[in-house]
């Protein structure tokens, strides 16, 4: 029996000579990443995505489903939820009922990636029916197809679930597979931006050829990082896999049908995080330079990256705050901000607040030399004020500002309110009391029915006033038009 490989990165003083070409998912070609440091303290928490226990594996899994023709995408996803007894399911972008092909179904934790998958590029194979023969034949059709690439204006079809507004969508590439002028049929492949209507593209092709056309059949062959050649499964596969586990406790089929969510993130550039910084990132902290282990070449400022652990788990999708050049030269600063956290909180233990500065701050707070929020007060040592930099303060050092405000308040003597001001305030209060007494006297002794009637009339009067006001505003706007 072949020995099972442990796909985990260990601390090392020098650059690794392990060949990671065959390692799975985010750890593939790990040895080619640029090294910031090889030293870190491994924490025995979390596990490799392929070795998670079955419950965690399903809860952070995705299925590359071959959607059948006729049911809608939402129906299919609802069936999957019922079959797998999951809490939440989501999909990578709606397919029309008659359209078949690649529908990525995300389960529980993986639903956090739905938004990014819906915006990913798509590829389709389409059968188009022309309404008549074209004189130029295949060459003319190919030319028309090439013309309709790049940014195109599109309006959603008549029967669509969205508002029919004119929008711009990009067609990256298209290829003609087959064309039959006698039968007025053509088959072509197209790679496009998310939200492109192939039905509208077919109508535009017909207009360009001068004969009219419509879409006969459509299949999605790729959605984001997953294509129909990469472990696509049917609804029957999912049903059988769940049955096999329920009745024979065999989880191998389920593990084959469901893929870890990391398989959707293989196209992102990677940043490897130390185990001690993982939980802080899960709580939304920015990743700083001390928490960085390795990073990919070619990262640009503002680019979306995936933050991962040494075991190959995805922690979050982040926005890079430094380019690759800065990451290799800087000794402090923010590496990335969290855009969407994927990992569960407290899967790794908390390791923040254990540094020398944090411990010193705790000591000063407990001895009363800092206030309960960690800000400086009059008892704060001068050394702390000059050396400590509060990064959470918006403008400059907030602790110093707080001290200045306190000192200012103590320095300026409190002004006593003048006699005239007191008298005028008393007069206003007396007038208010008289008004309240009059109101109470007017409604004294009324029955509950009378009170209800009075309230109803008051409400009607208010509504009438509102209607009159809105009508007046409408008339004014019409006049201005």
From Swiss-Prot:
The keyword Ribonucleoprotein applies. Its EC number is 5.4.99.-. One of its GO terms (molecular function) is DNA binding. It catalyses: uridine in 5S rRNA = pseudouridine in 5S rRNA; uridine in snRNA = pseudouridine in snRNA; a uridine in mRNA = a pseudouridine in mRNA. It is an enzyme of class 5 (isomerase). GO terms for biological process: anisotropic cell growth; box H/ACA sno(s)RNA 3'-end processing; conidium formation; endocytosis; establishment of cell polarity; mRNA pseudouridine synthesis; rRNA pseudouridine synthesis; snRNA pseudouridine synthesis. Component of the small nucleolar ribonucleoprotein particles containing H/ACA-type snoRNAs (H/ACA snoRNPs). Catalytic subunit of H/ACA small nucleolar ribonucleoprotein (H/ACA snoRNP) complex, which catalyzes pseudouridylation of rRNA. This involves the isomerization of uridine such that the ribose is subsequently attached to C5, instead of the normal N1. Pseudouridine ('psi') residues may serve to stabilize the conformation of rRNAs and play a central role in ribosomal RNA processing. The H/ACA snoRNP complex also mediates pseudouridylation of other types of RNAs. Catalyzes pseudouridylation at position 93 in U2 snRNA. This is H/ACA ribonucleoprotein complex subunit CBF5. It comes from Emericella nidulans (strain FGSC A4 / ATCC 38163 / CBS 112.46 / NRRL 194 / M139) (Aspergillus nidulans).
């Amino acid at each position: 029996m072949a020995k099972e490989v442990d796909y985990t990165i260990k601390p090392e003083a020098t650059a690794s000579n392990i060949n990671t070409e065959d390692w799975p998912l985010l750890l593939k070609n790990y040895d080619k990443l640029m090294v910031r440091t090889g030293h870190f303290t491994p924490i025995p928490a979390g596990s490799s995505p392929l070795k998670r226990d079955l419950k965690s594996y399903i809860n952070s899994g995705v299925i590359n489903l071959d959607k059948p023709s006729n049911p809608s995408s939402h129906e299919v996803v609802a069936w999957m939820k019922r079959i797998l007894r999951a809490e939440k399911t989501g999909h990578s972008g709606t397919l029309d009922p008659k359209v078949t092909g690649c529908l990525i179904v995300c389960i529980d934790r993986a639903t956090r990636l739905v938004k990014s998958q819906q915006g990913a590029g798509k590829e389709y194979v389409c059968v188009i029916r022309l309404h008549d023969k074209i004189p130029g034949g295949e060459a003319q059709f190919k030319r028309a197809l090439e013309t309709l690439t790049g940014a195109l204006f599109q309006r959603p079809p008549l029967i669509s679930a969205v508002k029919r507004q004119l929008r711009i969508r990009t067609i990256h590439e298209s290829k003609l597979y087959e064309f039959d002028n006698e039968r007025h049929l053509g088959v072509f492949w197209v790679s496009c931006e998310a939200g492109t209507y192939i039905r509208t593209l077919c109508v535009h092709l017909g207009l360009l050829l001068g004969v009219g056309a419509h879409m006969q059949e459509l299949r999605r062959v790729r959605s984001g990082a997953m294509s129909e050649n990469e472990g696509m499964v049917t609804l029957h596969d999912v049903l059988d896999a769940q049955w096999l586990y329920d009745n024979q406790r065999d989880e191998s089929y389920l593990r084959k049908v469901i893929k870890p969510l990391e398989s959707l993130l293989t196209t992102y550039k990677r940043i490897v995080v130390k185990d001690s910084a993982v939980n802080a990132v899960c709580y939304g902290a920015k990743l700083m330079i001390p928490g960085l282990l390795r990073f990919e070449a070619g990262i640009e400022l503002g680019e979306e990256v995936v933050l991962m652990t040494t075991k190959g788990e995805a922690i979050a999708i982040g926005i890079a705050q430094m380019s690759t050049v800065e990451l290799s030269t800087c000794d402090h600063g923010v590496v990335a901000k969290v855009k969407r956290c994927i990992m569960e909180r407290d899967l790794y233990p908390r390791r923040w607040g254990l540094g020398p500065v944090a411990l010193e701050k705790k000591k000063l707070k407990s001895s009363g030399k800092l206030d309960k929020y960690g800000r400086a007060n009059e008892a704060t040592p001068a050394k702390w004020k000059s050396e400590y930099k509060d990064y959470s303060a918006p403008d400059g050092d907030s602790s110093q500002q707080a001290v200045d405000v306190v000192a200012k308040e103590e320095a300026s003597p409190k002004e006593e309110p003048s006699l005239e001001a007191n008298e005028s305030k008393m007069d206003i209060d007396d007038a208010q009391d008289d008004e309240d007494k009059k109101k109470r006297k007017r409604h004294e002794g009324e029955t509950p029915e009378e009170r209800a009637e009075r309230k109803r009339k008051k409400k009607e009067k208010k509504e009438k006033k509102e209607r009159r006001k809105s009508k007046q505003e409408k008339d004014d706007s019409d006049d201005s038009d």
